[in-house]
Amino acid sequence: MEKKIEAYQAAVQKGILLNANEGYANLSDEIIQEIAQALPSIHFNRYPDNSQEALLEAYGKVMGISPDQLLAGNGSDQMLGLLIGTYLGKGKKLFTFDPDFSMYDYYASAYEAGVEKFDLKEDGRLDIDAFIAQGRKDKVDLVLFSNPNNPTGHCLSVDEIRKITEAFAPVPVVVDEAYMEFSDEVSALTLINEEKNLYVTRTLSKAYALAGVRVGFMVSSQENMKTMKASAVPYALNSVSMKIAEIVLGHADETKQRIEEIKARRNAFCEKVKDFRRIQMHNSQANFLYGKCADKEKLLEAFDAAGIVIRNYKGKDTFRITIGSEAECQAAYEVLKNFEEI
């Protein structure tokens, strides 16, 4: 019987783009010039360095992680796919949140695995004890969730992550930290050396403004990474992507400044919309805001009329808005404000 896998809906590319949680601005002219000067050193006729040595050293230096605990791939999506393919298959079960990142379902379906979901509370929070109880009852084979959560923006504490990881051991627990740079919580990376069933994925697509380059990482214990590296597709990253990533990772100050600007803009946006009645917006620890509106279709029409593209969750009364530039956020706020006052 032929499998039916629902296609992932890629982001729209026209208008004011506040739908894909990308960086709102391109890299600085200084970094772009450095990249241009580095291109002639690349041997385009040769396969890329499969050891990923320079890239893993650069990322490890920034994150304070040993390179032998790292693996890079074509976006963190590929790392998630590798983990799901390793631990799941026909008759196996993935356990995740609802709502959460839709690619988890996509990969699980591709490997003919089942997906068990646990509903988050109305405010995006998790009932951890109930989550653990359901997962144990269902005898799941892999636990996977984003933190901060995509789309709610809520972030679990490192102690909550530890509780989940220890409760499910030896079942693998994967924490997708695509948006962790925007959070004030402590990363699950601090648990890597003590929780042997824990994996963390990271990306350069969000905080590092490299969505167009597609570089992501998997992090775990040295023992786990030996197994994962043996299973990984060879030459997963091209030479150009690796070189660009290495250069950007060398400009930590610029990345930090960008992150702080986005966090400040996000917090200001949250403050302005917190008392709205027609629209309910969640506080967020990511680079986006999650909202709910009973009359969402009319709200979407208002955004469309303003030339602003936001993320619409079909079949639900929810939506998500990326924190863009100051002008983009103001334009999005004006749509919400005008809708609120109708």
Q: PLM ranges: what are they?
A:
Residues 159, 302-306, 311-342:
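PLP-dependent enzyme catalytic core of the Aspartate aminotransferase-like
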Residues 86-141, 145:
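PLP-dependent aminotransferase-like
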